[in-house]
């Protein structure tokens, strides 16, 4: 599979009184064509900022990309101007948000919101775009699409709105779909349907998905590969099967053991002690050291780099240094 | 677009629990607006006043400037519905023609100042930073000058006339609208659907004017309605002071000024009464309609 998106050493900083706050600090990963990659981590680990950096939208929320490159096929997105970005947003890269209740404009009809993208990116005539929009709505499972076109968002349920969002996001057949916690705000039965729909459609269009979530259930269901982030850094990068079978990084292990097991006999859930340090107050050594059960002396003073484990996975931990791992 | 399969997959087809007829915004709006009896009354009276102003030449029994010194200070009666003034002019006819001036000045200056205020307020609220600072300081400066003095000064520099009055009301009236719209934009710009619009590649000007602005329209319409009333008042006040519409063109304000004489007020009560009554009624009706609109357009006020 050829690489679609390559993120290298991405550093996105925010500034408070000229003081830099590293929200994303040297993130590397890639997504192949047609692949679904999950980006996992606690709140504040930099998942959403990474996705906004790819979309070129961090500037508007006050962030700045300080270093690194984001390559979509052969285009370097970090050198793009706002105008260049407008041409690829929605067309080559699109995004679905967490809150379907608020991500549709309340004063525009569903039809207006779908046709807008088509008219803009595909240069369609109004009539043509309407027809295509109806097709798209049918594709995401609305049987009375014609009628939905005339509805305002407040008349639809959360699941229906999220399906409309999916229709909008996929309307121009993008190469990459960034889904920022697409199912968090939906109830469980709808979650599965929306996830299924998203996967089906992306397979059909050969669209890659960057799935941002903190729900490991969603990850195991939908993703091919998982990237675990902690404090703005990638700490582990592995296929889903490997990660769930044998988590390498103590943080990943912590995440996995803190999922309740339905038929398990543990009466108290395992929690990772402490909380995520704020990005303006990071520990000097390994960022996970203060919460890590396996922390060694050097973890407190030295920062581990991303190592390639013998299985080909990458992990950011000193534990694996001796096991014949080499620095990547 | 042949790569798309357009039949819906049955397993994901959900119940679409939507009643047959889509509830349009207009329908919801009318339902709420019609509940407010005062607003309806105001709208009806305003409609009558506006229509009679538009068709003034057809309705008015006399030309507005026709003098008849023999008939001066005639009390209201069949011949002169609202009596006559000191030149024997028919007051009813003059009020109809005066309505044209007052309403024209009211509507035109409000449309102008709303346009200026909305655009500047939207830019300030959306871009923030230096744009916001510059626009808002200009607003502060204009607002810190007492309106009536500014109006009088400007009127003395330019010659008074309907067009000059409209221009001046536009230049002073946009500030409050700009503040209102800026506030709306500051809160609306960070909504998720604005971010969503950005992620599909919508250009900035489209985001401002076709995504955010419609969401801010409610407060703008309400303030516009209330503003018409206050501009009519200001125009009357200026005309009353002699800086506004100049005789012989009739305006409600300068008719009042004509009548400001103790003996006139005692002997010909109808002379000041009717222009005053019309100013009062029109402004009151605009306020009633404005209140009604505010309730009807407020999304939080759900029946």
Swiss-Prot record, chain A:
The answer to whether keyword Secreted applies is no
Name of the protein in question: Oligopeptide transport ATP-binding protein AppD
- List the molecular function annotations (GO) for this entry: ATP binding; ATP hydrolysis activity
Residues binding ATP are 41-48
Q: One Gene Ontology cellular component annotation?
A: plasma membrane
PANTHER family associated with the record: DIPEPTIDE TRANSPORT ATP-BINDING PROTEIN DPPD, OLIGOPEPTIDE TRANSPORT ATP-BINDING PROTEIN APPD
Sequence similarity = Belongs to the ABC transporter superfamily.
Where found? Cell membrane
Q: How does it sit in the membrane?
A: Peripheral membrane protein
Q: Does the keyword Coiled coil apply?
A: no
Q: Which organism is it from?
A: Bacillus subtilis (strain 168)
Gene encoding the protein:
appD
Sorted UniProt keywords: ATP-binding, Cell membrane, Competence, Membrane, Nucleotide-binding, Peptide transport, Protein transport, Sporulation, Transport
Give GO BP annotations, semicolon-separated: establishment of competence for transformation; peptide transport; protein transport; sporulation resulting in formation of a cellular spore
SUPFAM superfamilies per the UniProt record, alphabetical: P-loop containing nucleoside triphosphate hydrolases (SSF52540)
Q: In which domain of life is the source organism classified?
A: Bacteria
Q: Can you give the residue ranges of the ABC transporter domain?
A: 5-256
Function, please? This protein is a component of an oligopeptide permease, a binding protein-dependent transport system. This APP system can completely substitute for the OPP system in both sporulation and genetic competence, though, unlike OPP, is incapable of transporting tripeptides. Probably responsible for energy coupling to the transport system.
Entry-linked Pfam families = ABC_tran, oligo_HPY
Curated annotation (Swiss-Prot), chain B:
- Principal location class: membrane
Question: Is Disulfide bond tagged as a keyword?
Answer: no
Q: Where are the transmembrane segments?
A: 39-59, 103-123, 138-158, 165-183, 212-232, 269-289
Topology class, membrane: Multi-pass membrane protein
User: One GO MF term, please?
Assistant: transmembrane transporter activity
Name the UniProt key words of this record, in alphabetical order: Cell membrane, Competence, Membrane, Peptide transport, Protein transport, Sporulation, Transmembrane, Transmembrane helix, Transport
> Which GO BP terms apply?
establishment of competence for transformation; peptide transport; protein transport; sporulation resulting in formation of a cellular spore
Q: Which residues form the ABC transmembrane type-1 domain?
A: 99-290
- Name the InterPro entries on file: BP-dependent_transpt_permease, MetI-like, MetI-like_sf, Oligopeptide_permease_AppC, OppC_N
One GO cellular-component annotation of the UniProt record comes to:
plasma membrane
Subcellular location as annotated: Cell membrane
- Gene3D superfamilies under this entry? MetI-like
Protein's job: This protein is a component of an oligopeptide permease, a binding protein-dependent transport system. This APP system can completely substitute for the OPP system in both sporulation and genetic competence, though, unlike OPP, is incapable of transporting tripeptides. Probably responsible for the translocation of the substrate across the membrane.
Family (UniProt): Belongs to the binding-protein-dependent transport system permease family. OppBC subfamily.
Listed name of the protein: Oligopeptide transport system permease protein AppC
Q: Which organism is it from?
A: Bacillus subtilis (strain 168)
